[in-house]
From Swiss-Prot:
Taxonomic superkingdom: Bacteria
Sorted UniProt keywords: Cytoplasm, Fatty acid biosynthesis, Fatty acid metabolism, Lipid biosynthesis, Lipid metabolism, Magnesium, Metal-binding, Transferase
Annotated EC: 2.7.8.7
Catalyses which reaction(s): apo-[ACP] + CoA = holo-[ACP] + adenosine 3',5'-bisphosphate + H(+)
MF annotations from Gene Ontology: holo-[acyl-carrier-protein] synthase activity; magnesium ion binding
InterPro entries associated with the record: 4-PPantetheinyl_Trfase_dom, 4-PPantetheinyl_Trfase_dom_sf, ACPS, Ppantetheine-prot_Trfase_dom
Cofactor(s) in the UniProt record: Mg(2+)
Cytoplasm among keywords: yes
Source organism per UniProt: Wolbachia sp. subsp. Brugia malayi (strain TRS)
Family note: Belongs to the P-Pant transferase superfamily. AcpS family.
Protein name per its UniProtKB record: Holo-[acyl-carrier-protein] synthase
Gene name in the database record: acpS
Gene Ontology terms: biological process: fatty acid biosynthetic process
Length: 125
């Protein structure tokens, strides 16, 4: 059963400007250590911004699927990672809330925009 659906779109140059202006302060507020470490592997700030923009969109889409931040979750509690085949996944550090739920995530980018779509499903009726 679908419990929530969320989508978000992010303007990548906006993330680049925020990254250039706030640097570590921005990264540490929004992203997990693993997300930050992976983002540093990109050779250019533009590619790093694209990577971060997709994760930002995914976190926003997930919060929208939840119905907002009312569950006590902050952006840094949400981690986006890719499996060995490249499929994106979303985990929440406060997993006790989602033990009976599956979270489906799709990420995409084209030109200056990154987008994410999240579906939260429950096996319970």
């Amino acid at each position: 059963m679908i419990r929530g659906i969320g989508t978000d779109i992010v303007y990548i140059p906006r993330i680049l400007r925020i990254l250039q202006k706030y640097g570590k302060k921005f990264l540490n507020k929004i992203y997990t250590e693993q997300e930050i470490e992976i983002s540093r592997k990109y050779n250019s700030q533009e590619m790093q911004a694209k990577y971060l923009a997709k994760r930002f969109a995914a976190k926003e889409a997930f919060v929208k699927a939840l119905g907002g931040f009312s569950h006590g979750i902050i952006m840094k509690d949400i981690e986006i990672y890719n499996d060995v085949r490249g499929k994106p996944h979303l985990t929440v550090s406060k997993n006790f809330i989602f033990k009976d739920h599956m979270i489906h995530l799709s990420l995409s980018d084209d030109g200056d925009c990154a987008t994410a779509f999240v579906i939260i499903c429950s096996s319970l009726p």
